[in-house]
């Protein structure tokens, strides 16, 4: 005998209902599953029905049999469940004995109930005539009058015109509520307050009711402010017996749809409760009610109760009544319909009691941060809560389920029960936190905020509590960290790395090992447990910047600054070293280099590259490294009036940025100007002084000052330094960007400065491009420099700084540096491996380039310029590019070359090579050539004023009256940034932001926006090991990712699926902590045309996108239409709810991308406004 026949036999033997035991549920989603469970306990056979769009819905799988409603395309997704005749035909064909309507759809439709009975099938619910007398809210008011139960003032019957609504408003005043006479769930309801558009509200309510319930009839009643919504669960048999199962508090609502329900009501006085329960039973008896239903009341601030309606059906929240009474309401419904009396079921009023409390939360796929906009998509992860006192009633809640825009957004109902309200509240919080739902937005963050609100804790909420409490929307959203990381790893597995500048894969196939340091006795130093030795930062923190500088000057020797964490990897590895690898070695560095003057670790190109290419937050890097290295000062590179940007910014932006840098961990600010323009330099210097940082005002060294006739000679430098000293600086910086300072020049310059300024600390920076930097820095030290820059051996030489070990060897026996040579060697082992890990960013430089004395390309730029030349197809013309760089420099007037001026020279050089132009050609054709923007900016004066002025007539020829000629500091021409407005805009666009976000946006608006998009998609990528950030994972390779202290993800790539030729996607399979996860990724190598509509750019205010997926009911504008801010442009229907899409600004419609009846996805582009018609504040 088959297992199905055995099961059927069991049902026949144990059926409580005899031969009539086949039940069909005319509904979808969660409620059929709930009904099937009770039916199965009664040994019944169950039948599900489903629309074509619901063919993968879970409810059809939970039934013994399931049948589709009609044929594909015959009905709309909602219309299928409203197809009465079709549903009854299915029931008759399959010999159904009972039909249960669930809630919503046809559950309150008397015509359907009548048709079911006439078809010879038992209807589980009140008879049609009772539905007519109570299900219609207007009829319910007549019932209340017969039962002498108070009601809220309202129209005596249904209304058909707007004028009738206006007449009521004129008689009773505002506010009023327009309500659908049929149905519920908050649909077909509109509150109208004074000044609102009554006609529009009436039209929307009737249209929504017609769509949801097939009947657009509405009525109007007085709207009570801040009432409680109390409902009483009723059961009535076919013999006139009625009992109540006590009350539920359903006051926590949004859009008149319940969000959280509590049973019993926590704060309802006993006498009010008793009166409501009595009235509920009285109403049921007067109307001859049968089966399950709910009498609903409002309770005002004076504890007066008003009857609203009887819902002639099972309610979504029946679960919590079951939990506090122990009564299976659905089972009772079925048995009453089969003829059982309440007495036979043991349901006597004096025997029915409550125990404890129960709370139900409806978990939906809605985004609370976007006004509860329904979200659609695929559930990538679904892991539910459980444990003592937790009940789940779900529908299509499983990994892989598709959330459609056609139906209600509820995923699962979570009901928690316990002995006290407070115990249950805490249990619910725990349960919600346990849920893991990924792939769509949910309302869980909102529910958690709601449950912890003091009003909810006290139980004193009211029906508009959510609307009246904006702080409920200050939510802490689920971070979804693991799933976002999987999306990145999946994309990497399918499409490879998209990091700009990466060529090939890392040579190192494992993670670098962290070396051990040893003390003088040979014992291993535990760098994670023992605090690092005190360093120069302790001096700074205790004594302040001035005394710090004084003690640096008094140090008997030459201190070293390690540039490995910034300029070294900028020069050798395209600035691509990640926070992950810096943080890994940071504790060891704090011990090994405890005597160092500073670590250069921030600012300059590292700032924008972190966001632009590494997808990291530079501020998070700074804070993380600061926490790991508390003893060594941090130094950053500040581009004077540019901050860390490439052009001048308003002074208040520089002040704001520097303050954030100081507050988050920067100690010493090397401030420079690319042209040694002292007016530009002063902006940065003053900002550092205001912030309380150490000022290292810096003069940029250019060329070989020993050559006769050079523009930048000793007198020039002495003159610039004198003005810097007058300006006020704690330390003097000398920045030799290209490494052209020869040892003899170093001796002369530093010696001259030391003689003239005996008390001023001098800090020298150079590059080893020519291979002479060790000798030059030795000469500086011997000539009296207080600090020189070096890099760890494996990250030194070529375009980087000189080797720390080579310099230590050169100074050994003559000058103390305070550095332990053995510790440096041990530290170097890590960076030797690290260099291999980042080999895919190495420039193809084989050795020193003494030609630097001719072309003067800065070390940090030389490798980038080589890469750019290769990208532009000029790699084979590298020698020509270097010659062009020298010519370009002289065309521009032989300027100081450091970011951003070095970029100007580089851009002009590449322009010349790619267009085969000589310097003579440039001079001759300047008035007809289209130069790179950076060259135009330079000649305009936006970068500053060069020493000796601009070359004429070239400047005039290049500008050609297209641009002005600035003669003052560019910042003086700029309006201060409105920091408060920027902060507000960023908050609205990106949610939780801080002052560091404002500073980042001020420096690089577009880069910051792109970074935020990446972070929203992939999360914090800085936690990934670099090998797995740059290279696809190997199958079955185990990746450990620590996302916070004590939380480590273990990820394994299982497989990459075949290409889906229709979608162009591949499925990538992972194990995450042993659990299978599947991610879909577009294969970018496939040229598959997408049929998707264009998406609106959320950062472009003249593009209007769909707020959610749904169907366009009405397009209200056309091309050329003039619209006002807030004016409706379209009406969208989704999840049985209508939403008006409004214009964000005044303007004229440029394009319309939709038509009536068209389906759209969330963010699909609907309308574009003419950009020039927008107010200046809203232009992109």
Swiss-Prot record:
GO terms for biological process: gluconeogenesis; pyruvate metabolic process. Keywords: Acetylation, ATP-binding, Biotin, Cytoplasm, Gluconeogenesis, Ligase, Metal-binding, Multifunctional enzyme, Nucleotide-binding, Zinc. Disulfide bonds: none annotated. A divalent metal cation binds at residues 567, 735, 765, 767. It comes from the Eukaryota. The modification N6-carboxylysine is found at residue 735. Pathway: Carbohydrate biosynthesis; gluconeogenesis. InterPro entries: Aldolase_TIM, ATP-grasp, BC-like_N, Biotin_BS, Biotin_carboxylation_dom, Biotin_COase_C, Biotin_lipoyl, Carboxylase_cons_dom. Transmembrane segments: none annotated. It is found in: Cytoplasm. Residues 1095-1170 form the Biotinyl-binding domain. Residues 19-471 form the Biotin carboxylation domain. Pyruvate carboxylase catalyzes a 2-step reaction, involving the ATP-dependent carboxylation of the covalently attached biotin in the first step and the transfer of the carboxyl group to pyruvate in the second. Present with 17000 molecules/cell in log phase SD medium. This is Pyruvate carboxylase 2. It comes from Saccharomyces cerevisiae (strain ATCC 204508 / S288c) (Baker's yeast).
């Amino acid at each position: 005998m088959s297992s199905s026949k055995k099961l059927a036999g069991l049902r026949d033997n144990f059926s409580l209902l005899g031969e009539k035991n086949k039940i069909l549920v005319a509904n979808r989603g969660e409620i059929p599953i709930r009904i099937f469970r009770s039916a199965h306990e009664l040994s019944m056979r169950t039948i599900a029905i489903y629309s074509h769009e619901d063919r993968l819905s879970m409810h059809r799988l939970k039934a013994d049999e399931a049948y589709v409603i009609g044929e594909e395309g015959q009905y709309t997704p909602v219309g299928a469940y409203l197809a009465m005749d079709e549903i009854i035909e299915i029931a008759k064909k399959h010999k159904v004995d009972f039909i249960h309507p669930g809630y919503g759809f046809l559950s309150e439709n008397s015509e359907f109930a009548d048709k079911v009975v006439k078809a010879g099938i038992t209807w589980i619910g009140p008879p049609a005539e009772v539905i007519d007398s109570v299900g219609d809210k207007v009829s319910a008011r007549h019932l209340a009058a017969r039962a002498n139960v108070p009601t809220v003032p309202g129209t005596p019957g249904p209304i058909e015109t707007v004028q009738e609504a206006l007449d009521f408003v004129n008689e009773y005043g505002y506010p009023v509520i327009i309500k659908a006479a049929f149905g519920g769930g908050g649909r077909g309801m509109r509150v109208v307050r004074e000044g609102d558009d009554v006609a529009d509200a009436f039209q929307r309510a009737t249209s929504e009711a017609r769509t949801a319930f097939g009947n657009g009839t509405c009525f109007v009643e007085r709207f009570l402010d801040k009432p409680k919504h109390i409902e009483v669960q009723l059961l009535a048999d076919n013999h006139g017996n009625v009992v109540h199962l006590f009350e539920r508090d359903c006051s926590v609502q949004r859009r008149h749809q319940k969000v959280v329900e509590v049973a019993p009501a926590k704060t309802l006085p006993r006498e009010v409760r008793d009166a409501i329960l009595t009235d509920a039973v009285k109403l049921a008896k007067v109307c001859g009610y049968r089966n399950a239903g709910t009498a609903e009341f409002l309770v005002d601030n004076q504890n007066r109760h008003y009857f609203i309606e009887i819902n002639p059906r099972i309610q979504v929240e029946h679960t919590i009544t079951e939990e506090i009474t122990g009564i299976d309401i659905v089972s009772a419904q079925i048995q009453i319909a089969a003829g059982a009396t309440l007495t036979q079921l043991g349901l006597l009023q004096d025997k029915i009691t409550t125990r404890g409390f129960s709370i139900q939360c409806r978990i939906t796929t809605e985004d609370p941060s976007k006004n509860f906009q329904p979200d659609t998509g695929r559930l990538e992860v679904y892991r539910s809560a459980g444990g003592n006192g937790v009940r789940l009633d779900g529908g299509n809640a499983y990994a892989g389920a598709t959330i459609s825009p056609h139906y209600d957004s509820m995923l699962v109902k979570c009901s928690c029960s316990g002995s006290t309200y407070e115990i249950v509240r805490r249990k619910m919080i725990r349960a919600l936190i346990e849920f893991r739902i990924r792939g769509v937005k949910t309302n869980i963050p909102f529910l958690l905020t709601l449950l912890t609100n003091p009003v909810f804790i006290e139980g004193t909420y009211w029906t508009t509590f959510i609307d009246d409490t904006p702080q409920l929307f200050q939510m802490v959203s689920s971070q979804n960290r693991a799933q976002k990381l999987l999306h990145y790893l999946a994309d990497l597995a399918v499409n490879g790395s998209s990091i700009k500048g990466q060529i090939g894969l890392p040579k190192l196939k494992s993670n670098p090992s962290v070396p051990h340091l040893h003390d003088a006795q040979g014992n291993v130093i535990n760098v994670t447990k023992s605090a690092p030795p005190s360093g120069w930062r302790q001096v700074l923190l205790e004594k302040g910047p001035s005394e710090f500088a004084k003690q640096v000057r008094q140090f008997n020797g030459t201190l070293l600054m390690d540039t490995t964490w910034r300029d070294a990897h900028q020069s050798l590895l395209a600035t691509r070293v990640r926070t992950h690898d810096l943080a890994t070695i940071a504790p060891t560095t704090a011990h090994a280099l405890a005597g160092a003057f500073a670590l250069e670790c921030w600012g300059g190109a590292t700032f924008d590259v972190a966001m632009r290419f590494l997808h990291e937050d530079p501020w998070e890097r700074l804070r993380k490294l600061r926490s790991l290295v508390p003893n060594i000062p941090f130094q950053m590179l500040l581009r004077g009036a540019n901050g860390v940007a490439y052009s001048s910014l308003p002074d208040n932006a520089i002040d704001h940025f520097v303050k954030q840098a100081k507050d988050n961990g920067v100690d010493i600010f090397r401030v420079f100007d690319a042209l040694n323009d002292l007016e530009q330099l002063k902006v940065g210097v003053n900002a550092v002084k205001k912030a309380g940082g150490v000022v290292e005002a810096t003069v940029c060294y250019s060329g070989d000052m020993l050559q006769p006739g050079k523009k930048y000679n000793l007198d020039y430098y002495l003159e610039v330094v004198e003005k810097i000293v007058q300006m006020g600086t704690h330390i003097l910086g000398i920045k030799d960007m290209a490494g052209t300072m020869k040892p003899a020049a170093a001796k002369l310059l530093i010696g001259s400065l030391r003689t003239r300024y005996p008390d001023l600390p001098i800090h020298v920076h150079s590059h080893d491009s020519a291979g002479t930097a060790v000798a030059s820095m030795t000469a500086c030290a011997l000539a009296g420099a207080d600090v020189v820059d070096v890099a760890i051996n494996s990250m030194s030489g070529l375009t980087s700084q000189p080797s720390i070990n080579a310099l230590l060897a050169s100074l050994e026996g003559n000058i103390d540096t305070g550095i332990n040579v053995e510790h440096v060697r041990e530290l170097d082992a890590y960076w030797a491996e690290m260099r291999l890990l980042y080999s895919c960013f190495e420039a193809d430089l084989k050795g020193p380039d003494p030609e630097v004395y001719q072309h003067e390309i800065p070390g940090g730029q030389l490798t980038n310029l080589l890469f750019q030349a290769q990208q532009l197809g000029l790699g084979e013309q590298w020698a020509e590019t270097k010659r062009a760089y020298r010519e370009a420099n002289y065309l521009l007037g032989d300027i100081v070359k450091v970011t951003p001026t070095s970029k100007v020279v580089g851009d002009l050089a590449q322009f010349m090579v790619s267009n085969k132009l000589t310097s003579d050609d440039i001079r001759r054709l300047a008035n007809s050539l289209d130069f790179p923007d950076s060259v135009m900016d330079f000649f305009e004066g936006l970068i500053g004023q060069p020493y000796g002025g601009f070359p004429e007539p070239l400047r005039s020829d290049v500008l050609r009256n297209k641009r002005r000629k600035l003669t003052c500091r560019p910042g003086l021409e700029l309006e201060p940034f409105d920091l408060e407005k920027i902060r507000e805009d960023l908050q609205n666009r990106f949610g939780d932001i801080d002052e560091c976000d404002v500073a980042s946006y001020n420096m690089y608006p577009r880069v910051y926006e792109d970074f935020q998009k990446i972070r929203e998609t992939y999360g914090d990528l800085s936690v990934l090991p670099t090998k797995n950030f740059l290279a696809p994972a190997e199958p079955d390779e185990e990746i450990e990712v620590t996302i916070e202290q004590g939380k480590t993800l273990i990820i394994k790539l299982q497989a990459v699926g075949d290409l889906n030729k229709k979608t162009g996607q591949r499925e990538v399979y992972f194990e995450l902590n042993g659990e299978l996860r599947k991610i879909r990724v577009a294969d970018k190598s496939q040229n598959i045309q997408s049929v998707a509509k264009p998406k609106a750019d959320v950062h472009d205010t003249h593009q209007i996108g769909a707020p959610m997926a749904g169907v366009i009911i009405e397009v209200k504008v056309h091309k050329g239409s003039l619209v006002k801010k807030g004016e409706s442009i379209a009406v969208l229907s989704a999840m049985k709810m209508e939403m008006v899409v409004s214009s964000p600004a005044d303007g004229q419609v440029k394009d319309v991308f939709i038509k009536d009846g068209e389906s759209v996805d969330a963010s699909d582009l609907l309308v574009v406004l003419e950009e020039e018609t927008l107010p200046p504040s809203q232009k992109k």
